[in-house]
Amino acid sequence: MLLSDVDIQAALEDKLIQIDPFDPQMLQPASLDIRLSRYFRLFNNHTYAYIDPAEPQEALTRLVEVAENQAFVLHPGEFILGSTCETVSLSNDLAARLEGKSSLGRLGLLTHSTAGFIDPGFSGQITLELGNVATLPIKLWPGMKIGQLCFFQLSSPAKNAYGSPVCASRYQGQRGPTASLSHQHFYRARFTEIGL
C-alpha cells in the first residue's frame, strides 16, 4: 500500500519513518521531497581501462564538495553520484522508492539510473545516480529539491531487514555519495551449477 500524506505524517510521528533534517514543507500528497547535498562523486575516467564490478576499484571516483552558493554543472552525457541532505531511516515494515521530480525530468536530469528501491530497515543518506540526457549542461544547486520518496507498507515486517547480519547490507549508515561496493559479496552463478 502506498502511503498518503496523512499516513506519512503518522509514520513520522511514530518514528517508523525518520527524516533528519525534516522540513514539513517537503511533504507532498503521497511522497516526501528530498534535497541535494553539496557532495558529489566524479568518475576518474582515465584511471581504469574499464569498470569491473567484481573487483575493488578504490580510485574509480573522487569526492568533490561544492560551496553552498555554487552550482555543480552536470554536462550532457555525464554521470555522477550525489547524495540527499536528509538521512532516512525506515522501520522493518516500510520500504521506500526514490523517484525523480517531473520538472527536473523535463530538463533531462535523471535522479537515479536503476537503484531507486530502499529496503525496510535502511538507515543513511541516499546516494543519487545523477545523469544528464539533455543536450545542454544542467546546474545542480546544493539544497534544491532533487527527488521524492514514496513509502510502502509491507504485508508483514521483514524477518531480515536491511542491516541485519543475514543481509549483505553494504550501504547501511552511509553518509554522502557512496561509491559502489559491488565487489563485496560479488555473486556470479556458474551455468553448470544452475543447470544451464
From Swiss-Prot:
Keywords from the named record: Hydrolase, Nucleotide metabolism, Nucleotide-binding
Recorded catalytic activity of this chain's protein: dCTP + 2 H2O = dUMP + NH4(+) + diphosphate
Pathway field: Pyrimidine metabolism; dUMP biosynthesis; dUMP from dCTP: step 1/1
UniProt cross-references to Pfam families, sorted A to Z: DCD
Binding site residues for dCTP: 101-106, 119, 127-129, 148, 162, 174
UniProt enzyme class: hydrolase
Nucleotide-binding among keywords: yes
HAMAP family in UniProt: dCTP_deaminase
Sequence similarity: Belongs to the dCTP deaminase family.
Its job: Bifunctional enzyme that catalyzes both the deamination of dCTP to dUTP and the hydrolysis of dUTP to dUMP without releasing the toxic dUTP intermediate.
Protein's UniProt name: dCTP deaminase, dUMP-forming
Organism: Tropheryma whipplei (strain Twist) (Whipple's bacillus)
Gene that this polypeptide is encoded by: dcd
